[in-house]
C-alpha cells in the first residue's frame, strides 16, 4: 500500500472488540445483534472515509486516497468475516476465501465505487458456507455499499476464464483479503499456468478492441469538455487497460517493472504515475462532492473541483479552465503511453511469436519500400521508420513522416509515433523556420485526402504544438460553457475536417451553397490557413479575433503565403464571428443590416470565404449545434449581400413593391370570389406583404379564412421543415400588448426553443404571429405531434385554461447545470443598426420563461416589438428586439434608455418576481374583438 500510515483511518483492534461485544451482548437477540453490528460497522466506515477525504484535501494525493479507502474496506470486510465465522457460523472459519477483484483488487477504491468481491469455495461447499457469505453480503448491502460478487470454486473460475474475457480480467486483478488463503494461491497459480500462458496476443487484442468500443460509446475523443473520467478516452480505464496488458503479457506486479524491461523510459513512467494520481484525485473529489459514483466531470462540479485542486484565475483563463486544461493534457499523456506500450508489444511479438493476426501482430512479412522515400518504409499499410536515427539525421523528417503518410494513404506504426514523441526536442526554431518543413506542412493542411486525420495525429504526438507554438498554447484548452463541446485544438482540427468535406464536394445536402461556391474560391491555401488559425488566440485577455489576426500575420510569412494571401487570412480571422452574429441576431429584412454587413465585407470573394469559414466554425462546435435554420439564415444573408455587392440591390420604391406583392396574392387566391379577395388583401400592411413569401401568404389566407368560418377568435397552425430544422407555429389572435410574452411563455412551458418570431397585425386588429422553434425529432410525424402539443399549450394559456407562472415553473425545476455558469447580464440599446427601429440586444444566462418575461417588460414600457431574433449559445442567450414607441418612433432620451436597461437587467437577474406573478393568462376575449390599430403600419416581420 505504498508505505502509507493507516492508523488514523481506523483502529482495527478496537473495531473488532466492539463487534465481539455486540455478539456477546445479543446472544439470543439476532435482530438486535444485526442492527447493532450494522451501526458499529457503518460508523467506522463513515468516519474512516471522512478521514480519507480530509487527507485528500490536505495532501491532494488521489492514489493515496484510493489506497486509504481500499484499506479501510479490507478491514471492514475482514472484521465482518471474523464476526460471521466466530459468532454466526462458527463451523465455517477457513472454509472459504474472500478476495477483491476489479479496481478494488488493485488496492484502489473510489468513495462511491462498487465493491467487487470473489468468494472462493472448496469443492462441494456446505449450505452453511453459502449462508455465511449471504450474511456478509446483506450486512454490506445494509451499510449502503453496492457489492458486485461471485461465489465459485477454483475449478469453476478456471473453466469460466477460458471463455469469458471479463472474468479472466477480474481474476487477473484478484487480491486476497481474508479467509482460506490457499484457495486464492491455488487459483492464482493455476490461472497463470492454464489461462495466461500462451494467450497473450488473444487477451491483448480483446482488451484493445474493448477499449475502442468503449471510446466509441463515450465519445471517441479525449477532448470532450464534460469527460468521463473513468470510461472516456484518456481516462482511468485506459490506464487500467495498460495495467492489464502489462501484467498479462510481461507478468509484472508493478508498473515500475516496465522501466526495467525497457518498455517505458523513466520519464514515461513518471508521466504514468502522475496521470494515475491526478485522475484518481479528480475521481475521488467527484465522488465525495456528489455523494455518489459520478464518473462524468460535468459543468456543475468542475468549478468546485478546480477550487479543491487550488487553481486560481489568471488573465485570459478562469480557474476552472486552467484545471480542465490540466485534465486534458493528462488525458493526452495517457494516449502517448498507450501508443508506447502498443509499440513495445508489437516489437516483442515480432521477435517471439510469428503468425499472429489481428490488432497486435503485423510483422510476418518484409517491410516494403515507399516510392520516393528512403527515410520510411511501409509495414502492412502503416508508415514506419527505415532506421531509428531518421529524425536525428534530419529533423525535417518529423514533418515529412506525416506528409509521406498522407500522400500514400498510410496509417502510423505505433513505434514511429513513439519515436516522434521521444524526438519532440528536435523541433526547435531552426526547424520552424525551415522552408521545406513549412512547405510540407502546408501540403498536409491543404491536402485533398484527409488533412484533419493527419493534423490530429500530429497533435496527439505533440508535433503540432511544437511546430506551431501558438497552437501549443491552445492544446487541451477548454472554454467553460455549454456551447463548445470540444477543446480549442480539437475544435480547430474538426473545422479543417468540415472544410475538407466541402472541398471534396461531399456536403451538397447539408451545405448546398457552400458546396457550390467552394470550387470557385480563388485561394484555397488562404482559406485553409484561416480555418486552422481562426481561434489560435483563445485564452488571452484581448479579443481573440484581433489577437489571432496578429498571430496569423506572422505565421503566414513562415508558411510561405504571399502578401495578398496574408491579408485575406488576417481579415477572415478578424471577422470570423461577424457573419454568424449578424445572421443570428439581426433582422435580415432590415436594409441597414445588409448595407452595414456589406460595408465590412466589401468583396464577393471575401463574402464566399467568410460564409464557408462560418459554416465550418459552427459545425465544429459540437453535435446538435448546427441546424438547417442556421444554414437558412446564413444563405439569406449571403444572397442579400451578394446582390448588394453586385450592384443589384432593389431601389424600387417600397410602396410599389408592396402593391405588386398584394396583386400577386390577389391573383394566387383565384378560387376565391372577387369580393373575398379584395377584402382579404386589405387586411395586410406593407411589412407583411414585402417580407412573407407568397407561398406562406397563401397558407395564412386559408388558415385565417377557416378560423373566421369557424368563429374562432383564437387559432393555431403548425408545420415543420426538416431541411431548415425548424417547426413553425402560427397564432391568430386578437391583438394584445403582452401577446408575444404569453406566446413565448407558453412555448417555454412546452419545452420549445424559440429561434425567431415574426410579428404582424392585421387591419382589423388581429395579431398574426409566427414562431419558429428548433426541431426536436427527425421524423415529421413525431415533430408534428410535438408542434400540436405546443400549439395546444399556447391556446390553453391564452384562453386562461392554464396559468403561465405555474406551467413555466414545471420546466424550471432542473436548472442545476446552467447554474454552474455566471454570465453578467448586459443590455445594448442603439439607433444606429436600423433606419426605422431602435435595436435592443440583451445577453444573459438562459432559463425557462426568460423570453416571456423580457417581452412582458417591453410591453410594460410601452414599447412595440416589430421583430425579434432569439439566439442561444449553450447556456447563454442573445435576444435582439427591433422596437418603436407607441407612435412608431425610435426610442430617444437617456432617461428612457436607462429605465429600459434597468428593467431588462432586473428580469435577467431574476429580480422581477412580481412581474412573473402578474404574467397574464386568458387575455383572449370571448368574442373576436380587439383594439383597432392606427392606419399607420403597426408591426413588421422578420421572416428569413
Curated annotation (Swiss-Prot):
Record's comment describing the protein's domains: Has four distinct domains: an N-terminal nucleotidyltransferase (NT) domain responsible for UTase activity, a central HD domain that encodes UR activity, and two C-terminal ACT domains that seem to have a role in glutamine sensing.
Stated induction or repression of this protein's expression: Is constitutively expressed, irrespective of the nitrogen content of the medium.
Cofactor: Mg(2+)
Family of the protein in this entry: Belongs to the GlnD family.
Keyword set, alphabetical order: Hydrolase, Magnesium, Multifunctional enzyme, Nucleotidyltransferase, Repeat, Transferase
Domain ACT: 728-809, 839-918
Region (Uridylyl-removing): 372-727
Segments of this protein annotated with the region Uridylyltransferase: 1-371
Annotated region (Disordered), positions in chain: 911-944
PROSITE patterns on file: ACT, HD
Compositionally biased region (Low complexity): 925-935
Biological classification of the source: Bacteria, Pseudomonadati, Pseudomonadota, Alphaproteobacteria, Hyphomicrobiales
InterPro entries associated with the record: ACT-like_dom_sf, ACT_dom, HD/PDEase_dom, HD_domain, NT_sf, PII_UdlTrfase/GS_AdlTrfase, Polymerase_NTP_transf_dom, UTase/UR
TM ranges: none
Activity regulation, short description: Uridylyltransferase (UTase) activity is inhibited by glutamine, while glutamine likely activates uridylyl-removing (UR) activity.
EC number per UniProt: 2.7.7.59, 3.1.4.-
Protein name: Bifunctional uridylyltransferase/uridylyl-removing enzyme
Gene: glnD
Gene Ontology biological process terms in this record: regulation of nitrogen utilization
Disruption phenotype: Deletions in the 5'-region of this gene appear to be lethal. Insertion mutations in the central part of this gene abolishes the ability to use nitrate as a sole nitrogen source but not glutamine. In addition, neither uridylylation of PII nor induction of the ntr-regulated glnII gene (encoding glutamine synthetase II) under ammonium deficiency can be observed in mutant strains.
Pfam families: ACT, GlnD_UR_UTase, HD, NTP_transf_2
